[in-house]
Amino acid sequence: MTALVIRRALLDYARRPLNLVLLVAVPVVIVMALSGELAAFSKLLSTTSSPTHLEAATAGWAAAAVAGLAGFFEVIGSRTTDRRLAADSGRATPVVAGRLAASAVLAVAATAAALVALVARSGINDPLRAISAVLVVAIIYVAIGVLVGTLVRSEMNGALVVSVIWMLDVFVGAGLGGGSSVITRVFPLHFPTMVLTSQAAHRGGPIGDVGWSLIWAIGLSALAVARLAVITRPARHAAIAPALGEAATPPRQTVSPLSLPAAAVTPAPSLTVTVTTSDAPFAANRAHARSETRLAAALRAAMRDYGRNRVLWVLLLVVPVLFVALAAEQTPTKLMPVALVAGARHFTAMISLRHVHAAEMASVASALLAGIAGLFVVTGSAEGDRRLVLAGFRPRQVLAGHLGVIAGAAALTTVVSLAVSAAFFSPHQWVPYAGADLLIALTYAMIGVLLGPLTGRLGGLYLILVLAIVDVGYGQTVMFKSFPPSWGAFLPARGGGRLLLDGAFSSGSAQIGYLLLALGGLGALTAAAALVFKARIGMSRAQRTIPAPPSAVEVTPLGLTRLTGPLAAPEQTCGAKWDPGARKSEGRTER
């Protein structure tokens, strides 16, 4: 049973080949693209680590990101299946062991990819230390992912929790500046990072950094195993019911009225109604009013649906507060040069590093949360969206309802992020600064809407997580130099990032070029997302129209309806499928 669960879990993970590609590609991108930037950031925060040692830490962080999300999706998507397997076999242990082993295989694959990238990037000075520490980090985050998967029911909420834990762990708990405050020590990655960067200096007391790392790994793993066993173990009544056999739950006898003999049905007069419709279009004003009604109904239904998910809105409120406040609090107040633009004037100003970090972390939090919201809102309602299209809604009306929810989530995270950042600095121009932050959030929300149908939830989440950090966190930052890196010009947040910095730290008018760049990128992403959404759930007019032969509707004595006519089958009742080959020109029968 255990081997079967492992095999099926890995095959299910590999059902989308992109998942396997990203399992290897994400650690490689994080190590290759961010290790140098993180080394510069660490020097900026007065760290004592050498760049090579800090690059070793990026391998652990990359493995943690992939392993945590892989462990979460392994559990959240198979809870019902695992419970049924445990009920059929009478034992939950093989199922739990198989699920955990499959998650461990994915963690080992992510660890191997991160270590190979580290060797290619800078080499490994101490292979034993690096391999063991990165593996411990992967185990810690697999346990976190599994634990979150057993505690939450919504994939969106769980993905947000795992992603935010990882980002807080990297930006706050890892101790990039070489510090080890009380706040940083409560994060799981702090002590393994100290081991990876050779900064162990008895911060962990007599147990040591290695001891605390092992305590984190063993403790979280034990909690994850216990929780997974609890939710997988079949309920008592589910285990007793199969033993009772058919006597416990006798099958219900269902008799179709149409299968009864003719003598069983008392003859009665039947009412025959023939309804035909023409193909003439409705009046323009009536069609316009119906379109507005459907658009409002789609928006109202989407808001009501996600309004019930109170945990989501709590996360959207709490996460920016924690992320921005903790990141800014750990940043020193030293001055640094920042290149700014005020109208036609280009100048360099000396600004506190804490102010810059608070401003930029607000945009990172907004981008990440809005992107995840866009991804899960679209992918979580595909079947319902298709039903709405069959009911007569146009794909653009359905998409508009989803975009209303996504825009609300993006606006909420933006407002909260700006409010928290305002506790650390006061922007020179609130409107350009807030508008730029909102543009970045909406841009990443559209990226989530675009990626969801193309890559699936897990693949899209990997891409959004990496892109938000690489683009907003490092591609548009001025914390390493006085101006953003040149390679960031090819990423989506360049226009909004420049507007954000100029609005936060200069008093001149915004540059029209960057504003047009941000709006143009948002418009292009929205158009692309609409096309992908329509291709996924949209249907042609012929598919939405149910042609029927010219027949009559007979109301039977039992209150059922039956087609009469030369093409009606004897057993055909209302609700059966029409012949798709029938011609629309012959009319349509309304039921």
State each model region's role.
Residues 1-7, 177-207, 294-297, 479-508:
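Short hydrophobic, aromatic-rich alpha-helical segments embedded in or entering the lipid bilayer
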Residues 1-26, 30, 236-248, 255, ...:
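Aromatic- and glycine-rich beta-strand/loop motifs that create alpha-glucan
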Residues 18-21, 135-173, 314, 431-434, ...:
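A structural motif at transmembrane helix-loop-helix junctions in multipass membrane proteins
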Residues 23, 67-68, 194-261, 265-271, ...:
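Alpha-helical transmembrane segments of multi-pass membrane transporters/translocases
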Residues 25, 32-38, 155-190, 325-331, ...:
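Transmembrane helix segments
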Residues 54-77, 315, 354-380:
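Long, hydrophobic alpha-helical segments
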Residues 68-90, 338-341, 370-393:
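Transmembrane helix boundary and interhelical loop/hinge segments in multi-pass membrane proteins
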Residues 100-152, 210, 403-455, 515-516:
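Alpha-helical transmembrane segments and their short interhelical loops
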